[in-house]
């Protein structure tokens, strides 16, 4: 299911498809109102979509299914714009938070996907269309966010309390997957609610993918943005964008300067430098957008607080500048 934000005042043949983070879905990311307003006089309209993993279903999801569904939505938008304007126009995929993992997974994995997950046996992989552009906003590490909670505590729970919860979740998850069951096992809500809330079922498989206990040497599928990932690990993700060939132009990234989901030990500017190096590789034209990628000064994770007007203005300016390079 997808929704378009558009205007009848101007022709808008080009499209941005927006994917939110864990727990998000259509109408949950408040700064999109600023983006839509900024797009009104342009040739771009914005689409949001509901994935199988949207809202409280993220704990049962996985990136292959997410990006297959994104690909189907891209095809739908292209057909819709063709019927309306006579051509598909350009399309940009923009991810917020863990939605940025969808962007990188879409661009870096085999096309179509080759996995055959027993826990999602009905999944049929599709060929993913080439994108004209891609934007990652607030790309954060779920693993490091967990480590930050273990260091600082969460709510009324001390760091020591959270360490006990985490260790128990890790032990339960490892035990659940040890037998190689073809089905997902749901972790006890009494444990997961301490971190993720009472309304979110979380499978052992997805928790291990997010927590990625074998990182940084052997990161899981969901561990794409941790600050301790080295060149060899980044080469398998950012470094695969060029050879996979699903991006016609450049990749842009915006990190929130005051992102409460990022630990204080993370060098945000350093992250952009590492990702740029891995994306561009050793040869060929640059496919990392150095001009528009940035750390947004003072921005919180979702730019949703009352004091975020200036960070939202900065974000919209960067997005509009990036889109102008594609026309």
What kind of region is each of these model predictions?
Residues 2-56, 76, 264-265:
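Short, surface-exposed "cap/lid" segments of acyl-processing enzymes
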Residues 9-10, 150, 156-327:
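Serine-hydrolase catalytic core
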Residues 79-178, 208-211, 215-218, 222-226:
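Primarily recognizes the serine-hydrolase "nucleophile elbow" in alpha/beta-hydrolase
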Residues 54-59, 302-305:
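A short acidic, helix-capping loop that chelates divalent metal ions and anchors anionic groups
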Residues 26-30, 111, 304:
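Short N-terminal helix/helix-N-cap motif within the alpha/beta-hydrolase-1
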Residues 31, 59-85, 105-108:
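Alpha/beta-hydrolase active-site loop
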Residues 21-22, 97, 140, 257-259:
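Residue-level signal for short, function-critical loop segments
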Residues 18-19, 137, 296:
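Alpha/beta-hydrolase
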């Amino acid at each position: 299911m997808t929704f378009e934000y558009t205007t009848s005042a101007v022709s808008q043949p080009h499209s941005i498809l927006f994917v939110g983070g864990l727990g998000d879905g259509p109408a949950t990311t408040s700064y999109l109102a600023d983006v839509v307003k900024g797009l009104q006089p342009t040739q771009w309209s914005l689409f949001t979509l509901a994935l199988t993993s949207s809202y409280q279903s993220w704990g049962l999801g996985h990136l292959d299914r997410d990006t297959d569904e994104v690909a189907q939505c891209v095809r739908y938008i292209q057909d819709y714009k063709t019927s309306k304007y006579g051509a598909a126009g350009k399309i940009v995929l923009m991810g917020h938070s863990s939605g940025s993992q969808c962007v990188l997974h879409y661009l870096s994995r085999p096309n179509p996907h080759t996995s055959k997950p027993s826990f999602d046996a009905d999944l049929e992989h599709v060929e993913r269309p080439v994108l004209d552009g891609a934007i990652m906003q607030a790309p954060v590490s779920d693993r490091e966010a967990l480590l930050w909670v273990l260091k600082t505590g969460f709510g009324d729970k001390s760091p020591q309390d959270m360490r006990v919860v985490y260790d128990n979740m890790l032990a339960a998850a490892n035990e659940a997957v040890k037998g190689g069951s073809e089905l997902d096992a749901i972790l006890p809500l009494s444990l997961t609610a301490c971190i993720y809330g009472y309304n979110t079922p979380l499978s052992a498989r997805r928790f291990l993918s997010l927590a990625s206990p074998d990182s940084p040497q052997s990161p899981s599928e969901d561990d794409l943005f941790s600050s301790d990932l080295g060149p060899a690990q980044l080469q398998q993700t950012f470094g695969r964008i060029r050879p996979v060939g699903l991006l016609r132009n450049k990749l842009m990234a915006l990190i929130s300067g005051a992102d409460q989901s990022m630990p204080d030990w993370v060098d945000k500017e350093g992250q952009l430098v590492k990702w740029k190096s891995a994306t561009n590789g050793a040869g060929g034209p640059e496919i990392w957008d150095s001009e528009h990628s940035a750390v947004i000064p003072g921005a919180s994770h979702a730019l949703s607080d009352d004091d975020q007007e200036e960070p939202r203005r900065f974000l919209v300016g960067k997005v509009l500048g990036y889109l102008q390079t594609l026309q």
